[in-house]
Amino acid sequence: MLPLALSSYTTDWLDLLVRWLHVIAGIAWIGSSFYFIALDNHLHLPEQARDAGEGIGGEAWEIHGGGFYHVLKYKVAPPKLPEPLLWFKWEAYTTWLSGFALLIVLYYVHAGSNLVDRSVADLSSGQAVLISVGLLVGGWILYDVLCRTVGQRSELLLAVAILGIAVAAAYGSSRLFAPRAAYLQVGSMLGTMMAANVFFVIIPAHWELVRAKKAGREPEPLPGLRAKQRSVHNNYLTLPVVFTMISNHFPITYGHSRSWLILVALMVIGAWVRHFFNLRHVGVTAWWIPVTTAAGIALVAVLIRPASAPSVGVTPGKPATGSAQAGRAVFASAGCAACHTLRRAGAKGTVGPNLDAVKPSRELVVDRVTNGQGVMPSFKGKLSPQQIEEVAGYVSSVAGK
């Protein structure tokens, strides 16, 4: 799709470094989100009347790393603007930028094999990339409008509306993109909402506080209220997004015929778990939440359990002989049928690219099997050079026939 001539080795290094950066930044962002929500929920009225008179709205005592901490939160601002002032924003920005870079390296550069599955939707690489980017932008715009309209009247209705966005995105992505990419698309859309919350709402609200203090005026209350609302939303979205990040390793979810419904169920469960801890922070222990969470996960696991192992049998017909028969045997023993569709091998996997639709050349199959690509592992060392040649020859000769 994109005019980049990258070797598989170079792509692997880009994948490694960008993925590493993405995980590091994500940990920092999630950690700060969890910490500040917990801190806000643990604040209590100041014990000293002097503190209340200075505009302090809450305080908390903490112990960590061998020492005590006394945290004070002002209702509006301190008497004097402190310097330096620590901001929490680059964790979010770096997470999104590295995540989008990863989306480009793994899915947009290789859209024809990783983003598109023509057995799902007959899209060109360019169309798939444009739709993907459009969903990222459109998802944020719709969410932001809902927050500024419905969210001003009812948090419950807003929560239902946000769930509706997630359901629509999950279903739509499952009908447009390759199964594995569909989950990442939904996670990327939610992650874009979270990062945009920080960039367009939360940080501008903080700047309003700073400017108001410098100008000696009362800050506008609405930006602060919106910032708090979006911060809470980000907190609840963290675990659903983390699931989409790790989902590529579990084809039992995105490879299912009802993959979109599984995604919605597990994202709701993730947000439900987050709700348990947020309640704990205010002294409410709702043990029925982990009980219903365990029951929900068990129900999903039972409902999606395959009736039998993926078929790797041979389509009835004239039996293959010689190298073709050997290649078909390697295709079966290496587990290729669990991820790929190849009619002549009786393979109906929906996880990886549909080989009948892609019709890969022998050279391409050799490269992918030897070096891997994206989340497809390398089989170098697991298969002998002869076996790799045999399976490459077999796939290239029967794909699409």
Which residues does each PLM region occupy?
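Polytopic transmembrane helical bundles with strong interfacial aromatic enrichment
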Residues: 1-314
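Electrostatic cytochrome c docking/interface patches
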Residues: 7-11, 310-332, 351, 364, ...
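Short, thiol/selenol-centered motifs that function as redox-active sites or metal-ligating centers
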Residues: 34, 49, 336-342
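Gly/Gly-Pro-rich "capping" loops immediately C-terminal to redox-active cysteine motifs
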Residues: 328-332, 338-383
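C-terminal capping alpha-helices of c-type cytochrome domains
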Residues: 369, 382-401
